[in-house]
Each structure stands twice: as structure tokens, then as C-alpha cells.
Amino acid sequence: MAKHRYLPMTEQDEKEMLEVIGVKSIDDLFQDIPEKIRFKRDYDLKPAKSEPALLRELSKLASKNANTSEYASFLGAGVYSHYIPTVVDHVISRSEFYTAYTPYQPEISQGELQAIFEFQTMIAELTGMDLANSSMYDGGTALAEAAMLASGHTKRKKILISGAVHPESINVLKTYATGQHIEVEVIPEVDGKTDIDVLKKALSDDIAGFVVQYPNFYGQVEPLAELEKLVHENNSLLLVSSNPLSLGLLTPPGEFGADIVVGDSQVFGIPESFGGPHCGFFAVTNKLMRKVPGRLVGETVDENGKRGYVLTLQAREQHIRRDKATSNICSNQALNALASSVAMATLGKTGLVEMAKQNLDKSHYAKQKFRENGFEVLFSDGFFNEFVVKLSKPIKEVNESLLDEGIIGGYDLGFYDAKYEQHMLVAVTEMRTKEEIDAFVASLEGVK
């Protein structure tokens, strides 16, 4: 009989399997692990609980979390509290989507492939690019993959990246670049934007591309037109990491001449979930189509002339070319991409613009309230839904006290950059009300 209720392998099964591979016991399988680091104590597990008792205990533990359904959140820095239409969970919970993996057999995967195709189409339209892929793991890895593409396309081994890009994305890029022997140089920011004078001096004939965030980590809108001219005059690629919601109002990077646009679609239909999983996107111009990482779904017709969808240009991919592939990403975030697609389709063009406008209006209202109450707000007013406020106490302490008032405070910028100690990055989305914004400003009155 089976040793464990939910593990169907019996003792006889175990014995036969060990005999086939030529070992006497399970312990023999771990002989490569040094004896001194093996765990040999009792697990000291508590007695089993009934399901109702277990649910009560887990609910008690979960209640310690500060969640955005009960707290007013002003935390952003790449992950945001946005409205998720109720239809999103209903659609993505359908079994034909929820269990689907990479649809290699198009004849039995038309629904999944069409959903991915629609995601690609919406991302391409938002970014102003020619095409987009089926998704990436997240915005950070999409950015790193874009840099790898730029290096491979230009045959150059150096990437410049703005210091106003999210610090975690910079770290992901550096990790990718190490294995590919690509040099990464960070161009410092000044007044919350890329230092263009430093960029001009850094551009040379060994630069594959320049990475900029739009809006950037500090919420500021970078001058893409000026950056595009500098980068392309150097025959390098312009790589833009963008918040797709902001593109409901801002001019799309593609219209400025960006070569690659990446980002994270978490803002559409995907909860914060402690930072992931989310959904990266990757959009390019036609000239880079055959070098795009990940899956591409294309529209075609079958032998009867009916419209159909297939995975296309697969010779780029690692399951075909192995070490010669354009990338070693071997999957996508199809379920989360579907969530974003449903959210965007539900909002529609008018709703998406309205959602973006509420982010802009409410964040600028909050900025004005801070200034009226004597707070120092840094940088220009050219921001989308995030801005920086200087306080007189460590942000960690401030945020702990805010929790007692039912508020999740902004991001502690000193975590990554000492010069921004006691500076809070405040995010204001469409979810925040005037009353919540006023209460937030009032709660910080003692630390301005």
C-alpha cells in the first residue's frame, strides 16, 4: 500500500524503481551531498489539523498582511494597485485557458492562439510598434532580453542604461550581461531624468543601444525625441521600457522612433501578488522581427480558406536552434497575458484613456496638496502617476506608522540610493479617492 495518502507510489513500486536504477535505498540517491550538510533531525511537525481548523489558522496568518482591498495604497515603483474588472478572473479561470501551456498544436489550440494574437495586437497598438511577441516573464527580463537583442543585432558589446531606470531592472540587465560578456554602463540621472550631457560623451561606436524608462523610475517623462536623435546618430538602438497605461495619454515610444519597447502589463488585470508573477511585453520594428525572443503568433488561412492562428517564425527559438537561438526563454506568461487582454478589451480605448487620465489628474492633485501643506516635492511637474516627496524622518519609520492609519505608504528611495534617504516615491492611481489622498497628506504633516 502507499505510504502517504496523496502519494500513490507503494513500497513495491519504490523497490522496483530502485532495482531498475541499481541502488539499494533512497539515501543512495543523495550520496553526492556531503554528509555534514544533510538534514538528519526529526521534522517536528505539529499534529494534523482538520480542514476547518487549518483554514482558520491560515486566515489568521493572512490577516497580518496589509492588502490593498482594505488599505489605501500609495506604493508603486513598478507594481501598482489598479482596478481589475470582475470579468477578468471569470475568463482566465475557464479550464481551456487555465490549464493551457504553449500551444504547439494549432489545430487544437485556436482559442488560446487567438487570445495571444489579440494581446500582441493590443500591445503593438499601445506602443506604436510594428509587432509584439506573446509575452515575457516580466518587465525586468524583457528589458534584459531587449539589450541582448541590441547587442546581437549591432555586433557591439556595450549597453548604456539610464540611472533613472528601475534599479531592479538595471540589476537584471547586469546579471544577463555578465554571462554574455557584455559591458553595462549606467548613465547618471540629474533632477530625476537622464543626464543628457553624460550620455553624449558616453556614446561611441561600441555602443549597441541605450535603455531609457518612460515614464522613468522617479515618475518623470523623459525627452524621447532628443534621446532618439542622439542614439540613432550613433547608429545604436533606442530601447524604451514603458508603463503601458501611461501610453493611453503619452505619445507612444514607437512614434519617437524607438527600436524596441518593453514593459510589464501588470497594470492591466493583474494583481500585485507580492511582486509577481506578472507579464512582460516585448514590441519591435519590422526590421527586428526575426530576432524577437519568445513566441510569436501569426494569422493565416487553412486549406479551406478559413482564418487560423499558428506559432510562426519558430526557427528563432531555443526548441529549434538550441545554442543559436535568439533567446533561451522557453515559455511565456500566456495566462497573465490573457488577463491583461481581457482587462484592456473590457476598458476599451475610451476606458483606457479615462483610466490613464484619472492617474494623471489624481497624482497631480496629490502633488499640489503636498506643496500647499509645505512639503518639498522634487523634480518637474512632467510626471504621469508618481512623484518624489522629501520627508524629515526615515521612510521605513514613516510607513510603519502609516499602517496604523490604514495607509500603505510610498516607496523608500533610500533603499537603492543613499542620496535619496528620507525621500518617498508616491504613486497615485485611479483607485485612490480625494478623501484618501487628503488623509494621506494629513498623516504626514508631522514629518515634512
Swiss-Prot record:
Cited InterPro entries: GcvPA, GDC-P_N, GDC_P, PyrdxlP-dep_Trfase, PyrdxlP-dep_Trfase_major, PyrdxlP-dep_Trfase_small
Xref: Pfam families: GDC-P
EC numbers, comma separated: 1.4.4.2
GO biological process, one term: nucleoside metabolic process
UniProt entry keywords in alphabetical sequence: Oxidoreductase
Main enzyme class: oxidoreductase
Reactions that this protein is recorded to catalyse: N(6)-[(R)-lipoyl]-L-lysyl-[glycine-cleavage complex H protein] + glycine + H(+) = N(6)-[(R)-S(8)-aminomethyldihydrolipoyl]-L-lysyl-[glycine-cleavage complex H protein] + CO2
Gene Ontology molecular-function annotations: glycine dehydrogenase (decarboxylating) activity
Subunit structure of this chain's protein: The glycine cleavage system is composed of four proteins: P, T, L and H. In this organism, the P 'protein' is a heterodimer of two subunits.
HAMAP family (alphabetical): GcvPA
PANTHER family from the UniProt entry: GLYCINE CLEAVAGE SYSTEM P-PROTEIN, GLYCINE DEHYDROGENASE (DECARBOXYLATING)
Family from the record: Belongs to the GcvP family. N-terminal subunit subfamily.
The protein's role, per its UniProt record: The glycine cleavage system catalyzes the degradation of glycine. The P protein binds the alpha-amino group of glycine through its pyridoxal phosphate cofactor; CO(2) is released and the remaining methylamine moiety is then transferred to the lipoamide cofactor of the H protein.
Name of the protein described by the UniProt record: Probable glycine dehydrogenase (decarboxylating) subunit 1
Source species taxonomy: Bacteria, Bacillati, Bacillota, Bacilli, Bacillales
